[in-house]
């Protein structure tokens, strides 16, 4: 018995000695790290290694504007006081942005950061435009985004300023679209990508601003692309061989957008609700888009007044005179800041020409048009004028005014 036990112990010891070197050798062999790849073929730089990736991009817009405002006087001192100003010529760099995007640590973890070196808004002159953490499960059609990014309301607003058909967005944008805010969104599509949905909650305080009231901003959006996915790009410079149609509706409520809640009111602040209906159609040589908005502002705190109702729309269409190269377009937009006030609308009409070398990444756009104020515009309340083009100091009141503007913009993006 004792001999058998000794034999078993001896055999076990020999086995351990035999296995130990193999284990030690195996432990010393670490898996080779994934190959690191660098691609700069599209202007920007993309570095990737396994599930980790980083893309560095940038966008710059160089703009020249000539603006002639009817009956406008900007002089505060000197001989020009009381005399209508002539055309004002101005060179500007409205946007100069750097973007970082990619994935980290897990195949479902994505990120996107965007900084604007040009003028920005927000606390402490924040330069942050986007700061997004995205969870996108592999093989799924939904995602979760958190951070600061565009509220999913208004097709033209969520379409990048670098992918517009005109030099800039319509006058409806500032009035009805929340633009960027801090919050969280759950979104997804059907497997065919013909139906999509988004729902989210945001501060409502606007870009790079902390919460200023108790109740947040909520938003929901549903889209239908019956002819295939619609990309967020205006114009036909990127159009495929077949046309695509886009339809959508969005609703929001709660906080007033862009931090317009009355200063000092935190509890039971006035709410704001709005509905947006969106349309776009893109073909190889034709593009059209339109949106209509209806908005109601509650007015009970700090002063009780009837609710303020406003509405507006914009519509534009363009044609490629040279496929993928040269495009002409026209736009019309109108806003009633207070539907209970007659003859107080503000309107916009513009024509545009765009020339594309590398679609929207390298292009020049020129547009000319007028922003007109009806005779009763000056009678609107400050709340009704919020988000509308500011008329400034005028030498006349109670009559229709028209401001003419010519803009040329060169854009480089990669």
Segments from the language model and where they lie:
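Outer-membrane beta-barrel pore domains
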Residues: 30-38, 69, 83-85, 135, ...
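Positively charged n-region of N-terminal signal peptides that target proteins for export
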Residues: 1-6
